[in-house]
From Swiss-Prot:
GO term, biological process aspect, one: blood vessel diameter maintenance
Organism: Cyprinus carpio
Biological function: Urotensin is found in the teleost caudal neurosecretory system. It has a suggested role in osmoregulation and as a corticotropin-releasing factor. The non-hormonal portion of this precursor may be a urotensin binding protein, urophysin.
InterPro entries: Urotensin_II
Name the UniProt record assigns to this protein: Prepro-urotensin II-alpha
Length: 125
């Protein structure tokens, strides 16, 4: 009896942890009581942010393949928050985060041949 209770409690606990890990889908109901300005938040200016720290951050962002942006010297971050620069990098080249289509087994698109009398459907001889 005690074993069944312990087993059911552990299964319940394990299933709840997966539900808690999901992000909130509707953020309109949530209130944000953060600072009103960057000065209150203690934001980091681009001059205070070390170039080596930014390089480490960009290397972590380029997960799939090497980005030529990582080797640039004197990287300047526009604005007050380095997250904006990272977001611009990710939105600029989104194909770097997607693995090549050959790994997914996708086929090439069908291309019609001109003047093919020996064709049946899409198979031409």
């Amino acid at each position: 009896m005690m074993c069944n209770l312990l087993l059911s409690f552990s299964v319940l606990l394990l299933s709840c942890t997966h539900l808690v890990a999901h992000p909130v889908t509707d953020t309109a109901d949530m209130t944000y009581s953060g600072p009103d300005s960057v000065e209150e938040a203690g934001g980091v200016s681009p001059d205070d942010f070390a170039v080596s720290d930014l390089n480490d951050l960009l290397q972590r962002a380029a997960v799939v393949e090497y980005s030529p942006l990582l080797s640039r010297e004197n990287i300047k971050v526009p604005g007050q928050i380095p997250k904006e620069a990272l977001r611009e990098l990710l939105l600029e080249k989104p194909y770097r985060l997607i693995p090549p289509s050959g790994l997914w087994g996708s086929r090439r698109q069908f291309r019609k041949r001109g003047g093919g009398a020996d064709c049946f459907w899409k198979y031409c001889v």
